[in-house]
Design a protein with these regions (language model features):
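Peripheral, non-catalytic segments that deliver or gate enzyme domains
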Residues: 2-32, 37-42, 47-60, 64-82, ...
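Short mixed-charge
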Residues: 82-98
Length: 388
């Protein structure tokens, strides 16, 4: 494969992509059944009988919905009571004639018409805690489906975007992100295009800053700067209130840090200096998560879960690639955590994913090409509580 294809915005690479896209479209659209298949798929995607997929936040259920009347989609919410009452079957097994009562928050078709932009939905983060819980959200929108998007803060009480002039959080178009940084909604974690030298070769921002309302990105404290040749830098605050910083040296590896509350950070003035350096710069108070760079580590409750892509020998025990292991987070950070194997692959079964509920860890497995779920109930190390 020619090296010039690695140039994400290179004219030669983009021309090559356009040429091959056109050839592929011609081949696919020229088949005899193309129109029939497209019509059948559109009917399925636009069906009103679909079960709305919901996400819970601050006591409400949120859903993004598209259909023939709303091709770009509606972002809406409802209550548990309304959603359950209109389910296919009630608890007693009887059919329900009720209809879920949805509150439309954003109509992307209307928004696009009013602003003259074809907005494509890239997701939203509802504030889950504090006095503004369920009343503010950070919404990501892409112009025409581009990889780049913008973030805008919306007042969910009024459905109105809060302009920066009124203190609303806002991010210009980039492959970056904004994420809530505290319980009150007064600060955000900002990963933004800050101009020359701030983007990686892959086009992702290299720097994470924490901003207060009214601050520009240049004024925010610096939490992390990825190395010049890394894929980029990322940050998020989990539902237990912990702040995580991440770099990806390449597509297959990552480095992870926990930033404790009140930990020392770097002043705004260090930003340009850090961007000019070749190596990674991280806040002095951040704690590195010492796992293989090929692994994926995440914290659930007060446990650290580590998904392995390569064999890992710890304390004389080798955990094979494909395993999911865990340790109490506090003990692991102190160098004392003994790893527990939660899942070890076999000749027929491997782990495809996992998710945490309020009290259980649900593993999704594929065993002899058959999906299966396994529910684990780990002991708790402490009183860490999640947000809904």
């Amino acid at each position: 494969m020619p090296s010039w294809l690695d140039e994400v915005e290179g004219e030669r690479a983009l021309a090559w992509v356009a040429e091959h896209n056109a050839a592929t479209r011609a081949a696919v659209e020229g088949t005899e059944r193309f129109e029939t298949i497209r019509t059948e798929i559109e009917a399925i995607l636009d069906s009103s009988d679909r079960i709305p997929h919901v996400a819970q936040a601050a006591g409400r259920l949120y859903n993004f919905w598209t259909d023939a009347d709303h091709p770009h989609g509606l972002w809406r919410r409802t209550t548990w009571e309304s959603y359950r009452a209109s389910g296919p079957l009630r608890a007693g097994g009887t059919a329900s004639a009720a209809t879920t009562q949805w509150e439309t928050l954003i109509d992307l078709d209307d928004l696009g018409r009013s602003e003259g932009t074809t907005w494509v939905w890239h997701g939203a983060q509802v504030l889950r805690t504090g006095p503004l819980a369920g009343r503010r959200a950070l919404v990501d929108l892409s112009d025409g489906g581009s990889d780049t998007d913008v973030t805008r803060e919306v007042d969910l009480d009024t459905g109105r975007f809060i302009p920066p002039a009124e203190g609303g959080f806002h991010r210009e178009a980039s492959k970056g992100a904004l994420a809530w940084a505290d319980d009150a909604g007064d600060r955000v974690l900002a990963v933004v295009d800050a101009g020359e030298g701030s983007l990686s070769p892959a086009g992702y921002p290299r720097q994470v800053r924490r901003l207060r309302r009214g601050q520009s990105p240049a004024e925010g404290e610096v939490l992390l700067t990825a190395a010049a040749d890394d894929d980029g830098a990322w940050a998020h605050r989990d539902r237990w209130g912990r702040t995580w910083l991440l770099t990806r040296p390449d597509f297959y590896t990552e480095e992870l840090w926990l930033l404790p509350d009140g930990a020392r950070t770097l002043p705004p003035s260090t930003g340009p200096i850090a961007l000019a350096e070749d190596g990674t710069t991280v806040a002095p108070g951040a704690v590195h998560i010492d796992v293989p760079s090929s692994a994926r580590a995440t914290a659930v409750w007060d446990w650290l879960l580590i998904s392995l892509r390569e064999d890992w020998e710890v304390g004389g025990v080798t955990h094979p690639a494909g395993s999911l292991v865990a340790a109490p987070l506090t003990a692991f950070l102190a160098g004392q955590g003994r790893l527990q194997a939660l899942f070890t692959p076999t000749s027929s079964a491997f782990l495809t994913g996992f998710t945490a509920t309020a009290h259980h860890l649900v593993l999704t497995l594929l065993d002899d090409c058959v999906d299966a779920l396994e529910v684990l109930t780990p002991p708790r190390e402490g009183p860490v509580e999640g947000r809904d």
